């Protein structure tokens, strides 16, 4: 692989922005993270047959790269030492034939999650504490590659579907207008996702981390704007009707500045 391909993280077609400059703002770093994540997800789901074939155990140490133009590539690691960017897990091809296929893909997914975070925080090294915290929150709002590939996110959905739904459809009109639109099919969630589609990212409960579902009662905090299962914060639809401004437990416990 050409060294410049790996350095600017965009691949031959370019991923936006000239001169191979590194992303510097929280928004630009998150955009880079999201694009690389989309590339990795495509390799491990939509293009999995091609990816599997390229990871020949007879070849040398191979790595899975995701780029900021949403392209992926199986290639040898960078020759320069130290590398300009953190490198993904080395030798993913060696374990391919010695493991169950699903387990092997899950293992690659776990290592890919680690790599995606390391690249993002390599770029975030010069951000201040609050910006790093905000960046991590944005990244953490997306399911991990492992969750998507292993299906653990969907399993949690099935577990919740068996709960009593007698009051789930009674969602306060006060709190429904701002509910984020959620993609139902997780494995296709990032296809075609661009910088203007931020409102389509998954909404997760601020308490339990569960994914938003329209058949459950949710309430949004008017201070931090995070969303919560009503049952997680002990708020019923009837109680929500009488609340003019809802503060989540976290915001309620914060002392006002003197």
UniProtKB/Swiss-Prot annotation:
Family assignment from sequence similarity: Belongs to the Alfin family.
CDD domains: PHD_AL_plant
Compartment(s) where it occurs, according to its Swiss-Prot or TrEMBL record: Nucleus
Protein's recorded name: PHD finger protein ALFIN-LIKE 1
Domain of life of the organism encoding this protein: Eukaryota
Keywords from the named record: Chromatin regulator, Metal-binding, Nucleus, Transcription, Transcription regulation, Zinc, Zinc-finger
GO molecular function terms attached to this record: histone binding; transcription cis-regulatory region binding; transcription coregulator activity; zinc ion binding
Entry text on domains: The PHD-type zinc finger mediates the binding to H3K4me3.
Zn-finger (PHD-type) residues: 202-254
Main location: nucleus
Function: Histone-binding component that specifically recognizes H3 tails trimethylated on 'Lys-4' (H3K4me3), which mark transcription start sites of virtually all active genes.
Protein source organism: Oryza sativa subsp. indica (Rice)
Subunit-structure text: Interacts with H3K4me3 and to a lesser extent with H3K4me2.
Ranges of Acidic residues composition bias in the record: 188-199
Region (Disordered): 1-24, 150-200
Site (Histone H3K4me3 binding): 212, 218, 222, 227
């Amino acid at each position: 692989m050409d060294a410049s391909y790996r350095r600017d993280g965009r691949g031959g077609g370019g991923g936006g922005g000239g001169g191979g400059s590194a992303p510097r703002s929280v928004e630009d770093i998150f955009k880079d993270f999201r694009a690389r994540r989309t590339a990795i997800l495509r390799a491990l789901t939509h293009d999995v047959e091609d990816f599997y074939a390229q990871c020949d155990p007879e070849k040398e140490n191979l790595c899975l790269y995701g780029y900021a133009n949403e392209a992926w590539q199986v290639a040898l690691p960078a020759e320069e030492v130290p590398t300009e960017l953190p490198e993904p897990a080395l030798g993913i091809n060696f374990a391919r034939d010695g493991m169950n296929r699903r387990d092997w893909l899950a293992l690659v997914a776990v290592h890919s999650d680690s790599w995606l975070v390391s690249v993002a925080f390599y770029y975030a090294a010069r951000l201040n504490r609050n910006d790093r915290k905000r960046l991590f929150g944005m990244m953490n709002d997306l399911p991990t590659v492992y969750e998507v590939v292993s299906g653990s996110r969907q399993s949690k959905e099935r577990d919740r579907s068996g709960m009593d739904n007698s009051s789930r459809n009674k969602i306060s009109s006060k709190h429904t207008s701002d509910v984020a639109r959620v993609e139902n099919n997780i494995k296709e969630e990032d296809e075609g996702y661009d910088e203007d589609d931020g409102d389509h990212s998954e909404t997760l409960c601020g308490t339990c981390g569960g994914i938003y579902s329209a058949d459950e009662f949710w309430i949004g905090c008017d201070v931090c704007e995070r969303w919560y299962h009503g049952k997680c914060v002990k708020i019923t639809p009837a109680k929500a009707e009488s609340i003019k401004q809802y503060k989540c437990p976290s915001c309620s416990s914060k002392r006002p500045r003197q």
